[in-house]
From Swiss-Prot:
HAMAP family referenced in this protein's UniProt entry, alphabetically: Recomb_XerC_XerD
Main subcellular location: cytoplasm
Stretches that traverse the bilayer: none
Family named by the database record: Belongs to the 'phage' integrase family. XerC subfamily.
UniProt GO BP: cell division; chromosome segregation; DNA transposition
Recorded name of the encoding gene: xerC
PROSITE patterns per the UniProt record, alphabetical: CB (PS51900), TYR_RECOMBINASE (PS51898)
Keyword annotations: Cell cycle, Cell division, Chromosome partition, Cytoplasm, DNA integration, DNA recombination, DNA-binding
Name this protein carries in UniProt: Tyrosine recombinase XerC
Biological source species: Pseudomonas putida (strain W619)
Single annotated GO MF: tyrosine-based site-specific recombinase activity
Domain Tyr recombinase: start-end pairs: 106-285
């Protein structure tokens, strides 16, 4: 089983070009299945049956695994069996027809518009670190980039004159995104201080030593900005969520937001409609004369 898992991981890395983060998550999930099979005396992937996989899912659920984690595990198993079937190594899929236990869908945390502007409109010193960090914040919020997409940006991916940036998303899929006026200005100010010829690679966001900033360093800079400007915890994905929520709230164009976020399935994007409804419901409750609740009543 381990040998076939290694072959599948090599297929994901070399042919599907999945990210190392996704590859590691799938490997961990499939190693859990192997561990379970070993304890149950199941000799190989071809011997694993649907009722046994259902038992594993139930056990993981009782141990506190979230519905999202279990859905990912089942996705990893389905992907493996598709590969095994295609290679002629197996002729069934025990995950077919199985679904993860349903759980509460947590809505993503977002900044409201006023808080986003408070974060971005603070004064910026004209120095290397301040200009770089401001450009990072503006680009996250302007274009809805994932952390990995911003980390991997090279100078050749920018066309600030046209207000565009090209990113490489999940599964190696490229997409071109608009860059707003404020973000373009912040990027131009940063590139002026960054210099074009000095650093040894073409990374857009670099350290003083000329090295590409890694994901952890960018997370820490965003966190520091959140604490300094807002007095709250802030992470890159919250800026992506805020971008999506605010664009959807203004445009009501779910398909456009899906394309900008790089979601393969529109159901992933639809979670932002729940956020928009929350906002509308709050406005209604506070503004409609027949909606205002009397003090001390629950209905």
């Amino acid at each position: 089983m381990e040998r076939q898992l290694e072959a599948y991981c090599a297929h994901l890395r070399n042919e599907r070009q999945v990210s190392e983060h996704t590859l590691l998550a799938y490997r961990r999930d499939l190693e859990k299945v192997i561990e379970y099979c070993n304890t149950q005396g199941i000799a190989g992937w071809g011997a694993l049956q649907i009722q046994q996989l259902r038992q594993l899912i139930a056990r993981q659920h009782h141990q506190g695994q979230s519905s999202r984690s279990l859905a990912r595990l089942l996705s990893a198993v389905r992907g493996l069996y598709r590969y095994l079937n295609r290679e002629g190594l197996c002729q069934h899929d025990p995950a077919s027809g199985l679904s993860a236990p349903k759980g509460e869908r947590r809505l993503p945390k977002v900044l409201d518009t006023d808080r986003a502007l408070q974060l971005l409109d603070g004064g910026v010193d004209d120095d290397f670190i301040a200009r770089r960090d401001q450009a990072i914040l503006e680009l996250f919020y302007s274009s809805g980039l994932r952390l990995s997409e911003l980390t991997n940006l090279d100078l050749e991916h920018l066309d600030l004159a046209a207000g565009l940036v090209q990113v490489l998303g999940k599964g190696g899929k490229a997409r071109v995104l608009p860059v707003g006026r404020k973000a373009r200005e912040a990027m131009q100010q940063w590139l002026r201080l960054r210099g074009i010829g000095g650093p040894r690679d073409g990374a857009v966001f670099i350290s003083r030593q000329g090295n590409r900033l890694g994901p952890r360093a960018i997370q820490m800079r965003v966190k520091a900005a959140g604490e300094r400007e807002l007095g709250q915890h802030l992470h890159p994905h919250m800026l992506r969520h805020s971008f999506a929520s605010h664009v959807l709230e203004s445009s009501q164009d779910l398909r456009a937001v899906q394309e900008m976020l790089g979601h393969a399935d529109i159901s992933t994007t639809q979670i932002y409609t729940h956020l928009d409804f929350q906002h509308l419901a709050a406005v209604y409750d506070s503004a409609h004369p027949r909606a205002k609740r009397s003090k001390g009543t629950d209905s």
